[in-house]
């Protein structure tokens, strides 16, 4: 949905090595006298296991796994059943889409918080053309360019393009808070009006429009509603993203139709060619200052524009489209007590800041910050990460060591890694104050939504999300703005192709 240069959010120092209660150590206690005891820990040597699982017969195995993943079991049961079968959080399987879109669906799955971080180690894994998994969407959907998200840090263009994204974020930092306030005040006014008229209101459509308007206004200095694009942005982006992600999503159609339509053959890029051109024209017209910086970095205007479009529409808008409804769902389910605590904390700090939302004021809201981190832990906007082993590796789970051969593809499903019961208490629950206090803050290194630990920062040498701090900031702004205006809410939750579908059934103003 990534930022270090100017939106860097201060965190306590978490880089010192503090033994976790889950570390694989056996204590040895030596008594020297009646008054002194020395506790020495020694690591337990884990046994080496062959990676369990198999890929089945060519063609048939990948197809069967695809049907299980999407229809017969669903994602969670797909992984849980294999953990139980193999008695391991690391195993071999096929990942969609399989035939006939990808020639090699074979992966090694990592489903625990100990093994998962290897996917962030640029010295051990390569990220080239693995952003969407075992298949790569046609570059016809991105102007003929391999976009930043598909580049490995070792590729020359990676550094140039990531620097451009850092520049975009840092150069517009002063516009984020005021534009967010204006845009989301408009959204809340629309929700209020519809609630008065109908008694309930759908959240997703208005949230999508607000997200796109905010990104355009804050990062590019233009309100899209006042341009030729009008209010069409979210719909155009939705169709364009569908053409890229259809092999790994389901639309809820009848099983056979859904599988044949989405997972068997690539949909032709020509279906969204005119839509994409409208988006491209919008960004090209409003990126003059960014093109100057791009040319300094050795990037052409055309390549810069396609990358800016992708970063804004796919990464940022796509992330907000998925995450904001999921976060609101979790907050609603947290109940009135948490809502009251949030409202009191937020209103008190904003009042102390002279009635304005500031970065400093938000830093003094520990519960609000924890709620955002917990939402990112429970429902990360990007659930899957991939990497290709650069060399023969040994990867540890909590229970064993596994040997991986050079060239094998590693796949991590983050909602399992960030709900690891050996790291988190009540891992499947949304615990609003989980990250409050010194002990809570120590757990932030296990929040991994940004393609890296929350305690680390994006650089040109890694694949951590360039807008990491930006995403955290706008998520905090959403919670802060919401509880300045409202006291509590109730929602009904449905499903959508990307995330949750939210209907607000009650909304109490402050």
Swiss-Prot record:
Listed cofactors: heme b
Catalytic activity of the protein:
(13S)-hydroperoxy-(9Z,11E,15Z)-octadecatrienoate = (9Z,13S,15Z)-12,13-epoxyoctadeca-9,11,15-trienoate + H2O; (13S)-hydroperoxy-(9Z,11E)-octadecadienoate = (9Z,13S)-12,13-epoxyoctadeca-9,11-dienoate + H2O
Q: Where in the cell is it found?
A: Plastid, Chloroplast inner membrane
Stretch forming the transit peptide: 1-31
What upregulates it?
Answer: Up-regulated by wounding in local and systemic leaves.
Q: Where does (13S)-hydroperoxy-(9Z,11E)-octadecadienoate bind?
A: 315, 321
The molecular function terms in GO held by this entry are: allene oxide synthase activity; heme binding; iron ion binding; monooxygenase activity; oxidoreductase activity, acting on paired donors, with incorporation or reduction of molecular oxygen
Query: What UniProt keywords apply to this chain's record, in alphabetical order?
Result: Chloroplast, Fatty acid biosynthesis, Fatty acid metabolism, Heme, Iron, Lipid biosynthesis, Lipid metabolism, Lyase, Membrane, Metal-binding, Oxylipin biosynthesis, Plant defense, Plastid, Plastid inner membrane, Transit peptide
Q: In which tissues is it expressed?
A: Expressed in flower buds, leaves, roots, stems, petioles and cotyledons. Not detected in ripe fruits. Expressed in sieve elements.
User: Cross-referenced InterPro entries, in alphabetical order?
Assistant: Cyt_P450, Cyt_P450_E_grp-IV, Cyt_P450_sf
Superkingdom of source:
Eukaryota
The protein's matches in SUPFAM superfamilies, at most eight in alphabetical order, are given as: Cytochrome P450 (SSF48264)
GO cellular component terms, A-Z: chloroplast inner membrane
User: Which residues does (13S)-hydroperoxy-(9Z,11E,15Z)-octadecatrienoate bind?
Assistant: 315
Q: Specify the signal sequence span.
A: none
**The keyword Heme belongs to this UniProt entry's keyword annotation:** yes
Give membrane topology per the record: Peripheral membrane protein
Q: Binding of heme b: at which residues?
A: 127, 158, 162, 463, 465
Which residue windows are transmembrane per the record?
none
GO biological process entries? defense response; jasmonic acid biosynthetic process; oxylipin biosynthetic process
EC code: 4.2.1.92
Q: Does the keyword Lipid metabolism feature in the UniProt annotation? A: yes
Per the record, the similarity remark reads: Belongs to the cytochrome P450 family.
Q: Which purpose does this protein serve, as stated in its record?
A: Cytochrome P450 of the CYP74A subfamily involved in the biosynthesis of jasmonic acid from lipoxygenase-derived hydroperoxides of free fatty acids. Catalyzes the synthesis of unstable allene oxide, which is further converted spontaneously by hydrolysis or cyclization. Metabolizes 13- but not 9-hydroperoxides of linoleic and linolenic acids. Can use 15S-hydroperoxy-11(Z),13(E),17(Z)-eicosatrienoic acid (15-HPET) and 13S-hydroperoxy-9(Z),11(E),15(Z)-octadecatrienoic acid (13-HPOT) as substrates, but only 50% activity with 13S-hydroperoxy-9(Z),11(E)-octadecadienoic acid (13-HPOD).
Q: What is this protein called?
A: Allene oxide synthase 2, chloroplastic
């Amino acid at each position: 949905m990534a930022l270090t240069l100017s939106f860097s959010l201060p965190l306590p120092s978490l880089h010192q090595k503090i033994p976790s209660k889950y570390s694989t150590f056996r204590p040895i206690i030596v008594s020297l006298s009646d008054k002194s005891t020395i506790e020495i820990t020694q690591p337990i040597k884990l046994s080496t296991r062959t990676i369990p699982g198999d890929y089945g017969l060519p063609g048939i195995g990948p197809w069967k796994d695809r049907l299980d993943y999407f229809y017969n079991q669903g994602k969670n049961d797909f992984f849980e059943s294999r953990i139980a079968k193999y008695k391991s959080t690391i195993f071999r399987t096929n990942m969609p889409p399989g035939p006939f879109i990808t020639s090699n669906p074979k992966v090694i799955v990592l489903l625990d918080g100990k093994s998962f971080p290897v996917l962030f180690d640029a010295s051990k894994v390569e990220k080239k053309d693995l952003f969407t998994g075992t298949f790569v969407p046609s570059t016809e959907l991105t102007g003929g360019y391999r976009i930043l998200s598909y580049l490995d840090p070792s590729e020359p263009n990676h550094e140039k393009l990531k620097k451009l994204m850092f520049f975009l974020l840092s150069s517009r930092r002063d516009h984020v808070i005021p534009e967010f306030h204006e845009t989301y005040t408009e959204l809340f006014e629309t929700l209020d009006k519809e609630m008065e008229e109908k008694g309930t209101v759908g959240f997703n459509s208005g949230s999508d429009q607000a997200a796109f308007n905010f990104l355009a206004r804050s990062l590019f200095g233009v309100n899209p509603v006042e341009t030729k694009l009008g209010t069409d942005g979210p719909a155009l982006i939705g169709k364009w993203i569908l053409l890229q992600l259809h092999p790994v999503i389901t639309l809820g159609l009848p099983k056979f139709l859904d599988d044949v339509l989405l997972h068997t053959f690539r949909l032709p890029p020509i279906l969204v060619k005119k839509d994409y051109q409208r988006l491209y024209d919008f960004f090209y017209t409003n990126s003059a200052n960014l093109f100057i910086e791009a040319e300094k970095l050795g990037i052409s205007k055309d390549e810069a524009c396609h990358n800016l479009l992708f970063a804004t529409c796919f990464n940022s808008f796509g992330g907000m489209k998925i995450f904001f409804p999921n976060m609101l769902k979790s907050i609603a389910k947290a109940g009135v007590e948490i809502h009251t605590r949030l409202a009191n904390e937020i209103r008190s700090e904003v009042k102390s800041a002279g009635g304005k939302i500031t970065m400093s004021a938000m830093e003094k809201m520990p519960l609000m910050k924890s709620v955002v981190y917990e939402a990112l832990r429970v429902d990360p906007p990007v659930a899957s990460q991939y990497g290709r082993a650069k060399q023969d590796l040994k990867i540890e789970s909590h229970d064993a060591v596994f040997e991986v051969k050079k060239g094998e593809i590693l796949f991590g499903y983050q909602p399992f890694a960030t709900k690891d019961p050996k790291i988190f208490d009540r891992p499947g629950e949304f615990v609003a104050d989980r990250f409050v206090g010194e002990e809570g803050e120590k757990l932030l290194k296990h929040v991994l939504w940004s393609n890296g630990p929350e305690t680390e920062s994006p650089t040109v040498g890694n694949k951590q999300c360039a807008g990491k701090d930006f995403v955290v900031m706008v998520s905090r702004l959403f919670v802060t703005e919401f509880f300045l205006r409202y006291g509590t809410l109730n929602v009904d939750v449905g499903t959508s192709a990307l995330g949750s579908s939210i209907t607000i059934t009650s909304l109490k103003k402050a």
